[in-house]
């Protein structure tokens, strides 16, 4: 079993205290594990959240680091890997929650090799508010629709297309050799581009059952803004992502059937 670990948590206007506390408890319970937990803040603007996250410094082997010097999410995540002092890294997003009490053990005992990335996956948990969220929240409804694609069996059928950076375990040499693509300045598709780069460079992507849960969902206006930004990124890199995006696949099929004019007409009629 692997006995050293740098846990890297990107933070932006989210409290990471709950996640760090649970990860810290799990790490402390593993005999012989050398570890650190770094919550790295990429320029949060919410002062209340920043103040709350400073409590992380009170836990052993844990640090809250404010680092405002990145021009994109990809650069921030590449820099996170350089800050981790151990050979094995786990990257997990701040606003997610753990599902299993042996989350860390599942990764450390997964048989991970130096030349591969191991993905635990994601799930959706709206708790007692699930029915209301399904009616009112677009992000929750989308994630519930996609939930059927989150099983280990489905993800391993197309391991590179299913790669997500919200929750993955890797040897530091993986991202040193094949880093995030810093050409992506806007929101979205960093993980898709990284999965594509892994495939092109012989990095194995393996999926296991070790999900983190979405339990917080942004409002509809914020979510639609993210979608708009992601569509701009997709358009910019369409040539490279054509085999990795279902949306681009649909556009290709419409083009082959000479039906794109219908989509353009619909957009003119209903976009105001």
Question: Language-model features: where?
Answer:
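Non-catalytic, C-terminal membrane-associated alpha-helical segments of glycosyltransferases
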Residues: 226-236, 240-272
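Acidic donor-binding loop at a coil-to-helix junction in glycosyltransferase catalytic cores
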Residues: 186-194
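Short, well-formed alpha-helical segments that are part of the catalytic scaffolds
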Residues: 14-28
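Short, flexible, basic/aromatic active-site loop/helix in glycosyltransferases
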Residues: 138-160
